[in-house]
UniProtKB/Swiss-Prot annotation:
This is Myrosinase 2. Belongs to the glycosyl hydrolase 1 family. May degrade glucosinolates (glucose residue linked by a thioglucoside bound to an amino acid derivative) to glucose, sulfate and any of the products: thiocyanates, isothiocyanates, nitriles, epithionitriles or oxazolidine-2-thiones. These toxic degradation products can deter insect herbivores. Seems to function in abscisic acid (ABA) and methyl jasmonate (MeJA) signaling in guard cells. Functionally redundant with TGG1. SUPFAM superfamilies: (Trans)glycosidases.
Length: 547
C-alpha cells in the first residue's frame, strides 16, 4: 500500500502544481489573492506569504485528540460512552459506530507520534482516559499501572520530539462505575472522586506535564448529556426523548454544570496548593460559538445577547465573579443552584489559562417562553439558534449538514473574551473541519481542500485578533491529528489531517492535502503551490493580497 500511496501523493503534487499555475495565469496576478478579511470566498495558495512566522516565536502550533475517540477499549475499564453507545447504538452514529476499537492508539501510539513529527507541530493536546488509570473510578479501588505506563511512554515520546503535552483530565468519558453508583456529575460525590483522580495524575505525570486541562467543554455534558440525551450518559425528560433512561431536562443540566464547576475549581486549588512547585499551568476548556442577530430588530439583538450569556457566561461568570449571569438567575429562577461564599471564592480566578474551542457561528432570534411542563435548559435563554438569517443567508461556507462556518467569528470570540473576562491567557484548543467519512480509500480522502480553506481563514482572523486587538493567545491546536470516532457521528465524518484506515488501523497514517498544507505552514517559507488550491469560488473574479 505504501509504495502506491507515495506514487499517488507525488502525482497529486504535480497535478496540484499544474492547477496552481493555471489559476495564476488564467485569472490573476500572484499578488492579487483573496484576503482573509473577506467573509467568502478565501484562498490560501502560498504559505511563503502566510505562515507561522506571522505569529510570535513562542506561539505553540499543535494538533488535538481525545482518549475515547482514538485509543480503543483495550486495557481500560468501561466508561459512560461505552455504556451509551451499546445501550443506544443508533445514537453513536448513523453507522452505529462506537469507540470500541477506533484507531487503537493504545497499541499504535508510536504512529501518532510519527505523524506529529512529520507535521512539525510543537504541541499535542490529548486526554487521559479516567477508567484506564482507575478502572473502577476510585483511587481506593485500585490503580492500573499499565495505564500509567502507557501515558508515561506517550508523554516521554512527545518530549523526546520537542512536542509539548497538553493533557485533558476529563473529556466526557466518566468511568461507568461512578455513573452507576451515583449518576456521576449529578451528585457532589464526584468532586472528591475527580480530585483524587487528578491528584494521582499530578503525582505521576506532573514532572513532565506543564499544561493541564481540567474539563473539556463545560457546556457539553450538561446540555447534550442531560438535557437532550444525545450524548452520554443519555438522560433527559421523557417528552424530549422517550429513549432516555431517566432525567429532567429542566433541572439536571444545571446541577451537572454546577458540580462540574466545583470539581474544576477544587482540582485547580489542589494543583496550586500542593503541586505549584511543578511549575505548570491549569485551566478549563470552553466550547465557543459566535452569535449574530437573526435580523435587525431589537428582539433579535437582545436574543443574541442572551445566547452569549447562556452559552458562554453560564461558566465564565462563575469563573470570574463567583456567580451565574443575572439573566440566567432571572429566567431560570430556583432551578439554578447557588454558590455559597466559600464556593464563590474557590471559583473566582480558578484558571491560569482558558482553552477555547471554536467551530461555527449561529444566528439568534427571540423565542417565546415554554409552558411549565416543557421547560428545558435548551430554551431557557428565550433565544432560538439557527444557521440561516431572516433572508435565508448563512454566515459563511458550509461546515456540516445544516451548519456553516464564519472565520470572522474567531476574531469576535477572542475579542469578546478579552474585553468581557479580563484579558485571559488563551489557547485555541480545537478548531477543525469535517469531510465525508465511511470506508473511503486514501485516494478519495486526500482531496480535503475545504479543510485547507477552513484552517487558513480561521488562522488569518486569529492573527488579526492577536496583532490588532492584542488578545493574549499563545497556541492553536487543529482538530484533529487523524481521522477518529466522532461523538454521535461514528465514522461517517473525518476530521483528520492524516488518514486512518479503520479496516487496517496498524497501517501508516498518511497526510491528506490539509496535513501537507499545515506542514508547509509550519515550515515558515516553503512555497506550497504544488499541493494547494482554493475550493471556494472567487468573488467576481477579483483577488487581493493577504495583509
Amino acid at each position: 500500500m505504501q509504495h502506491n500511496t507515495y506514487i499517488y501523493i507525488l502525482t497529486m503534487k504535480l497535478l496540484g502544481f499544474a492547477l496552481a499555475i493555471l489559476l495564476v495565469v488564467a485569472t490573476c496576478k500572484p499578488e492579487e489573492e483573496i484576503t482573509c478579511e473577506e467573509n467568502v470566498p478565501f484562498t490560501c495558495s502560498q504559505t511563503d506569504r502566510f505562515n507561522k512566522q506571522d505569529f510570535e516565536s513562542d506561539f505553540i502550533f499543535g494538533v488535538a485528540s481525545s482518549a475515547y475517540q482514538i485509543e480503543g477499549g483495550r486495557g481500560r475499564g468501561l466508561n459512560v460512552w461505552d455504556g451509551f453507545t451499546h445501550r443506544y447504538p443508533e445514537k453513536g452514529g448513523a453507522d452505529l459506530g462506537n469507540g470500541d476499537t477506533t484507531c487503537d492508539s493504545y497499541r499504535t501510539w508510536q504512529k501518532d507520534l510519527d505523524v506529529m513529527e512529520e507535521l512539525g507541530v510543537k504541541g499535542y493536546r490529548f486526554s487521559f482516559a479516567w477508567s484506564r488509570i482507575l478502572p473502577k473510578g476510585k483511587r481506593s479501588r485500585g490503580i492500573n499501572e499499565d495505564g500509567i505506563n502507557y501515558y508515561s511512554g506517550l508523554i516521554d515520546g512527545l518530549i523526546a520530539r520537542n512536542i509539548t503535552p497538553f493533557v485533558t483530565l476529563f473529556h466526557w468519558d466518566l468511568p461507568q462505575s461512578l455513573q452507576d453508583e451515583y449518576e456521576g456529575f449529578l451528585d457532589r460525590t464526584i468532586i472528591d472522586d475527580f480530585k483524587d483522580y487528578a491528584d494521582l495524575c499530578f503525582e505521576r505525570f506532573g514532572d513532565r506535564v506543564k499544561h493541564w486541562i481540567t474539563i473539556n467543554q463545560l457546556f457539553t455534558v450538561p446540555t447534550r448529556g442531560y438535557a437532550l440525551g444525545t450524548d452520554a450518559p443519555g438522560r433527559c425528560s421523557q417528552w424530549v426523548d422517550k429513549r432516555c433512561y431517566g432525567g429532567d431536562s429542566s433541572t439536571e443540566p444545571y446541577i451537572v454544570a454546577h458540580n462540574q464547576l466545583l470539581a474544576h475549581a477544587t482540582v485547580v486549588d489542589l494543583y496550586r496548593t500542593r503541586y505549584k512547585y511543578q511549575g505548570g499551568k491549569i485551566g478549563p476548556v470552553m466550547i465557543t460559538r459566535w452569535f449574530l442577530p437573526y435580523d435587525d430588530t431589537l428582539e433579535s439583538k437582545q436574543a443574541t445577547w442572551r445566547a452569549k450569556e447562556f452559552f458562554l457566561g453560564w461558566f465564565m461568570e462563575p469563573l470570574t465573579k463567583g456567580k451565574y449571569p443575572y439573566i440566567m438567575r432571572k429566567l431560570v429562577g430556583n432551578r439554578l443552584p447557588k454558590f455559597n461564599s466559600t464556593e464563590a471564592r474557590l471559583l473566582k480566578g480558578s484558571y491560569d489559562f482558558l482553552g477555547l474551542n471554536y467551530y461555527v457561528t449561529q444566528y439568534a432570534h427571540a423565542l417565546d417562553p415554554s409552558p411549565p411542563e416543557k421547560l428545558t435548559a435548551m430554551t431557557d435563554s428565550l433565544a432560538n439558534l439557527t444557521s440561516l438569517d431572516a433572508n435565508g443567508q448563512p454566515p459563511g461556507p458550509p461546515f456540516s449538514k445544516g451548519s456553516y462556518y464564519h472565520p470572522r467569528g474567531m476574531l469576535n470570540v477572542m475579542e469578546h473574551f478579552k474585553t468581557k473576562y479580563g484579558d485571559p491567557l488563551i489557547y485555541v484548543t480545537e478548531n477543525g473541519f469535517s469531510t465525508s467519512g465511511g470506508p473511503i480509500p486514501f485516494t478519495e480522502a486526500f482531496h480535503d481542500y475545504n479543510r485547507i480553506d477552513y484552517l487558513c481563514s480561521h488562522l488569518c482572523f486569529l492573527r488579526k485578533a492577536i496583532k490588532e486587538k492584542r488578545v493574549n493567545v499563545k497556541g492553536y491546536f487543529v482538530w484533529s491529528l487523524g481521522d477518529n470516532y466522532e461523538f454521535c457521528n461514528g465514522y461517517t465524518v473525518r476530521f483528520g489531517l492524516s488518514y486512518v484506515d479503520f479496516n487496517n488501523v496498524t497501517a501508516d497514517r498518511d497526510l491528506k492535502a490539509s496535513g501537507l498544507w499545515y506542514q508547509s505552514f509550519l515550515r515558515d517559507t516553503t512555497k506550497n503551490q504544488d499541493i494547494l488550491r482554493s475550493s471556494l469560488p472567487f468573488k467576481n473574479g477579483d483577488r487581493k493580497s493577504l495583509t
